[in-house]
Amino acid sequence: MYIKAIMNRHRLLSAATDECNKKLGQACSSSLSPVHNFLNVQPEHRKTPFIRSQSPDSPGQLWPKNSSQSTFSRSSTFCTNLYLSSSSTSETQKHLGNSLPFLPDPSSYTHSASGVESARSPSIFTEDLGNQCDGGNSGSLLKDFLNLSGDACSDGDFHDFGCSNDSYCLSDQMELQFLSDELELAITDRAETPRLDEIYETPLASNPVTRLSPSQSCVPGAMSVDVVSSHPSPGSAANQKSRMRWTPELHESFVKAVIKLEGPEKATPKAVKKLMNVEGLTIYHVKSHLQKYRLAKYMPEKKEEKRTDNSEEKKLALSKSEADEKKKGAIQLTEALRMQMEVQKQLHEQLEVQRVLQLRIEEHAKYLEKMLEEQRKTGRWISSSSQTVLSPSDDSIPDSQNMSKTKASSPQPPLPAENKASETEDDKCESPQKRRRLENIAESEDPKR
């Protein structure tokens, strides 16, 4: 679209070429404004930030040239379409007074020029060509002013440029004004260009072409500069790195290269790139992938270490808990055994007490039997004594004697040993009583006689 706009512009401007050819030499010879010095006074190997960079085959191509001056070996300046505006001097002065309070005065021109020069970035626009055009004095002055090629001058890229010698400072200010208008830049007194990156992202639309009438050839007008870059600069291309998808095959070759270089710690992006030898692979791709590979390699190891540490801690905790449980179980077992021993001792003591009680009971039983036998014996003796005391008369006495004699004469059956023993004891107890009775009986019989 931009190339088409340029072609249309050149077609429109070619119509005004014939009218301005006569005035071009006069304008170039009499209008070497301080802009020429402002643009060309640059150190060697410095380039201006405003250069049209398109393919050489496109129409309307403007190329810088090498300067032939003795003080400067090389300088690149504006190569753009410069033309006069249809606005009047009063309107431009009002416009400059209102919208450009920051533009420098003629006395402080050198300070502003140095400030603008410091803001130029040589890495944004490149390419210098040394084609020169053959012409007269006006053509050589024009080429020194704009560093244009012969083809550019012949094609009519420079049209309707004219101003008087009294408007040097005003033309300088107007040039800066239209430069800022075209680029939509806020050029401050320190020559800062904060919106320079936006120029290369979205190209600006082509400006309408204004032509200067013959009556306005000597009137100081405003200049507009068309600055558009169709190709991104190397700096912006370096900043906008191309993304690349790592396929499994690329990753395998990357891993092999890293292994050959003795691991990811010793491997460098440059060496890995040389070993891989893949087209389109840059050192930035290798560097980022190497960093990711290092992170991916060390993260699982750290996780495994953490897992092992956690497992060891768990094992230690389990072993401690098991040891504590075993100790508690052993203590409980010892306490249970001790209690069992105490219970057994108590049982033995109870058995001994029972045995002693049984012995005592047996002794008491024997003693009671003896007492019962003695009571029986005493009962028999009392009964026999009561019978003897209660006998009725004396007649009965001889009968009793006879009976006793008969009893004594009659044989008696043998008594058992126990009865004999009891009788012997009874006899022993009763013998003194019998004697007393017999004595009493005998005394009673003697007085009767």
Swiss-Prot record:
Locations listed in the record: Nucleus
Short sequence motif named LHEQLE, residue ranges: 347-352
Regions crossing the membrane: none
Keyword Transcription regulation: yes
Single Gene Ontology MF annotation: DNA binding
Gene Ontology cellular component terms for the protein in this record: nucleus
Main location: nucleus
Family, per entry: Belongs to the MYB-CC family.
Lineage: Eukaryota, Viridiplantae, Streptophyta, Embryophyta, Tracheophyta
Coiled coil: none
UniProt keywords, alphabetically: Coiled coil, DNA-binding, Nucleus, Transcription, Transcription regulation
Region annotated Coiled coil, chain positions: 334-354
Compositional bias annotation for Polar residues: 381-410
Protein name per Swiss-Prot or TrEMBL: Myb family transcription factor PHL6
Species of the source: Arabidopsis thaliana
